[in-house]
A protein has these predicted regions:
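Active-site-adjacent substructure of cysteine-protease-like catalytic cores
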Residues: 142, 146-149, 168-176
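Flexible, glycine-rich phosphate/dinucleotide-binding loops
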Residues: 47, 78, 169, 193, ...
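Acidic carboxylate-rich catalytic motifs and surrounding loops in phosphoryl-/glycosyl-chemistry enzymes
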Residues: 74-76, 162-168, 223
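Functionally critical loop-and-helix segments that line ligand-binding/catalytic clefts
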Residues: 2-19, 179-268
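Short, aromatic/basic amphipathic alpha-helical patches
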Residues: 29, 55-60, 173-177, 203-206
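Aromatic-lined carbohydrate-recognition surfaces of secreted/lumenal glycan-active proteins
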Residues: 153-171, 184-188
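A generic structural signal for alpha->beta connector loops
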Residues: 66, 157-159, 181, 215
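Substrate-binding cleft of extracellular glycoside hydrolase catalytic domains
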Residues: 5-143, 155-156
Length: 270
């Protein structure tokens, strides 16, 4: 194993893209854009884009460039949505779907070199897309699915975090699940799309600051925006972070290792 996954708190700008950019594009953006974090859609039955570039060598190289990594698993989706692969309404079955997705995500994390040598460590965000919180059965099933995910991830020694909208996190009371969701990647978009240097994970319209308040938040603050930095244009969703992401240590020695104490400004350490 050439890389060891390490979790650290990143404070700064990040982005996600449905299809991961090329190594050359990412290297250019690291030099010229305000972004220092990038999402990795590592897998899941509901992942939209193939992300065929993703493998351990690719991830090692972008970590060597200096990127902070946000592994994300796009598994089954709430049964009251139109997604092709829902988890069941039955809460016991939904819980098991969460467990199974955690097992699959763990295997993929290990394949990509994102875990420690003992198969533990790392953080991965479960992507749960928007659902109708007025549908009580759907809310109950979704809560059970997330509990299955976090329960199994705790057993595996991996931080099983969650991507969801601020409305869903609040109205479905995801903040009071047991075991607790350790960190959240919150979808709440600004009215104006695109990069915003003043974007924050706090003072949101639909989620009080009381929940996930201690370096436990990422936020997707815009979506579907073409941005150009250093002459390279990529369609992205801009994000801001004050929460757990990954860096890689034990990299081959061609470049300095990224410190796990992370800061969003020009790649400098705290």
């Amino acid at each position: 194993q050439v890389s060891t996954g390490q979790v650290g708190i990143y404070k700064g700008q990040a982005f996600d893209a449905c299809e991961i950019p090329s190594l050359a594009q990412l290297n250019n953006w690291f030099q010229h854009s305000p972004y220092r974090g990038v999402n990795l859609y590592i897998g899941g039955i509901s992942r939209l884009c193939a992300n065929s570039n993703l493998n351990e060598a690719y991830i090692t190289e972008i970590a060597r460039q200096g990127w902070r990594l946000i592994p994300t698993w796009v598994g089954h989706q709430p049964p009251c949505t139109s997604f092709k692969y829902p988890f069941p309404y039955d809460v016991d079955e939904a819980f098991e779907y969460g467990v199974n997705n955690a097992n699959q995500a763990k295997d993929r994390m290990e394949t990509f070199g994102l875990l420690n040598s003992d198969g533990r460590g790392g953080v991965v965000y479960l992507d749960v897309e928007s659902f109708n919180t007025s549908n009580e059965a759907c809310v109950a099933a979704t809560r059970a699915y997330i509990r299955g995910w976090t329960t199994r991830m705790n057993e595996l020694g991996i931080m099983g975090a969650l991507y969801a909208s601020s409305i869903n996190l609040n109205k479905a009371k995801i903040y009071n699940l047991s075991p607790a969701v350790p960190a959240v990647w919150i979808a709440e978009w600004n009215i104006a799309r695109g990069f915003n240097p003043d974007a924050s994970v706090y003072d949101l319209r639909h989620l009080p600051n009381d929940y996930w308040y201690s370096e436990q938040r990422l936020r997707q603050y815009s979506g579907e925006k073409y941005e150009t930095w250093g002459g390279v244009t990529i369609e992205i969703d801009p994000n801001v972070a004050d929460g757990p992401v990954m860096a890689l240590t034990n990299l081959p020695p061609s470049r300095p290792v990224v410190s796990i104490t992370l800061n969003g400004q020009k790649g400098l350490d705290d």
